Amino acid sequence: MKVELFGVLREAVGAAEVDVDLAGPAPIAEVLDALVSDYPGLEEHLPRVACAVGDDMRSRADLVSPTETLVLLPPVSGG
């Protein structure tokens, strides 16, 4: 599945998009675990990210399929 990254997540990985191999539908939490295995620099940021598929916000328990694109949104800060 494709995973789109923004902000500090993109900087930690060095790419705007990465692929995660899924054999079938899996909870978002498992996708995040796979990302940390491939990109350890993400681990400190993932507890605060919001997850979305399309226009729908998703929880970490929600299933995603290999054909979907998971979007990870870091918290926005500034003034």
Residue ranges and their predicted role:
Residues 1-78:
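Ubiquitin-like/PB1-type beta-grasp interaction modules and other compact soluble beta-rich domains
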